[in-house]
Amino acid sequence: MTAVFDRRVPGIRSSDFQPPFQSAAAMHHPSQESPTLPESSATDSDYYSPTGAAPHGYCSPTSASYGKALNPYQYQYGMNGSAGTYPAKAYADYGYGSPYHQYGGAYGRGQSSAGQPEKEVAEPEVRMVNGKPKKVRKPRTIYSSFQLAALQRRFQKTQYLALPERAELAASLGLTQTQVKIWFQNKRSKIKKIMKNGEMPPEHSPSSSDPMACNSPQSPAVWEPQGSSRSLGHHGHGHPPAANPSPGSYLESPSAWYPAASPLGSHLQPHGSLQHPLALPSGTIY
């Protein structure tokens, strides 16, 4: 057993196998320093012979492609190391990832700065409260008395504004078009709700500046005495006995009951009674 092993060991450790192994070791050291080619590249695939491989997986000592694949890389490394124009250790000294991280950091900062306005716009709308998204309402617009009066006057004219009218009204009042539009929408919905309940909106009620509107509720009280006196006069002229004299006048003046018994011009009594029906009970002519 020992004799056979001693005989086979010199065959494995031959002089032909030693130089490629050293060159392979020399190649692996610069590949770790150089960032251009990783360790497992296309040149590493030439380490193994496609046809004749050793039982333990070592590469063939007489592989022609192995030497040819190493020569360009060795020459390139030699030129880079000697010339100094593009030194292979430059990336290793400064760090291969440093330029990438610098540019990456600048790009990341540019993205974050560009995304900041979007976050600022989105923050007032949604906010996390107790782990739940909650909409944050914008503060209500406080209108001045002048603005409210102008909006009310325009709303009485028309409940819907065109775009030019809305822009003109907003510019004259110092408001935005959105504020004017929302005010008109709220006013329309409020009036619809009031009319649905059967009530009259305050702006459509009779105004105090209209004299006819002020006098219209009092007109029955003003005309009632005149109507009552007219009705009394009508009944008095048409029906003389309908007058209401005092009870003593009936006892003192029997001529009211018997007009023909009067000694003076009885033919004038009916005419006089028709003209003055209320004067007969007060006194009689004898």
UniProtKB/Swiss-Prot annotation:
Listed Low complexity bias regions: 239-249
CDD domains assigned: homeodomain
GO MF assignments: DNA-binding transcription activator activity, RNA polymerase II-specific; DNA-binding transcription factor activity, RNA polymerase II-specific; HMG box domain binding; RNA polymerase II cis-regulatory region sequence-specific DNA binding
Keywords for the protein's UniProt record, in alphabetical order: Developmental protein, DNA-binding, Homeobox, Nucleus, Osteogenesis, Transcription, Transcription regulation
Comp. bias (Polar residues): 32-48, 205-219
Ranges of the DNA-binding region feature: 136-195
Source organism, top-level taxon: Eukaryota
Ranges annotated as spanning the membrane: none
Family affiliation: Belongs to the distal-less homeobox family.
Protein name from the UniProt record: Homeobox protein DLX-5
